[in-house]
């Protein structure tokens, strides 16, 4: 859900012309709006993509030092803002989106370099899309682990409703409820990939060696 571009333009501004920002929205029509907005904001170091993450991963394996996943979700946290989302939820509920999210989060972990950080975010209350998706990642990618998120007034810890989630430290995830702070409902989880002690950005290492041989 990179479009329409609010998060991408904010990240691009923080990069201040350094590095590379790759932003992806699988919807072609939404990606066009995304492209227009990053152009309007004058971000020079951005690469806009409209593709299934699985098709991107081979070209960016362990490439990124930071990844933001604003996952497609059932939107339960947005019902108060947009009643139309209730009808959409009735057609495609949490089960539909959980499968998509699990594919995306695993692919994201594969594109993260060792020592890198990845933020997973939804705007839903569903445990299936939130805590259970985090569980799925931690079981299938043991090199990933949760790290603390700074709490602000109104933040609540994620649910730890069984021993496995407690052992995985799901209390480090954050739930945001609209009755506790201004805004809509959200869930966020911050991960770090264990470092193997080697240069993770393989492409950078190759370029560096080539420069030294000249």
Place the predicted regions along the sequence by residue:
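S-adenosylmethionine
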Residues: 2-214
